[in-house]
Amino acid sequence: GVCHIVADDEIDAYARGRRLVGYFCQQGHFDRSKAEAGDIDLHALLPESPRRAYDVHPLIEALLDSDAPFEEFQSKWAPSMVVGLGRLSGRTVGVLANNPLRLGGCLNSESAEKAARFVRLCNAFGIPLVVIVDVPGYLPGVDQEWGGVVRRGAKLLHAFGEAEVPRVTLVTRKIYGGAYIAMNSRSLGATKVFAWPDAEVAVMGAKAAVGILHKKTLAATPESEREALHEELAAEHERIA
């Protein structure tokens, strides 16, 4: 969590340094005529199954200008949260994205703190934020409690709440529970929130909800039939949700 970027060699370090100076020093002056949008194939970027993990980096690169490389910060620390700078229509933007390939994209104490730092950095330099969301919630567990998930997680809400730069959120597959608020929700002052047509915005996923809502029914069902009934009820829940 200390080092932002590890370069391959001296030449790479100089190149990245120059690129970052260009991103940070834009100060509102940009040339849209030089912007080149990525080729976005939505069907290829996300898996068909909503439960299958995927790497969010190709999606980020497709959304940003192809002639300005995405410069990721702290890629080895809290990898379930991807943060970095790029350009969108020629304008420098800060990108935050859940990465389902790591911990399913869950928020935890470290990823929340990483994201909060980045939000404050972008706000200080007047850089707009693009938040790409696919999150099942906060990572549960005793380790997270001992790691200060409440204290460190609150930093992300505070960072978004006090940010004055434009902030746009895109929900790709799902956003559940408390993570809905934390990931730049309208409640925290998001400029705009968009969602793909099949995105889920809910308290919890269908399978978890069925386990609570139909607990007695499932308990009374023979064990050999319980899983099939659970799947059937979950499918019905998804259909009417």
Regions found by a protein language model. Give the residues of each.
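Ligand-binding clefts of soluble mixed alpha/beta catalytic domains
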Residues: 1-240
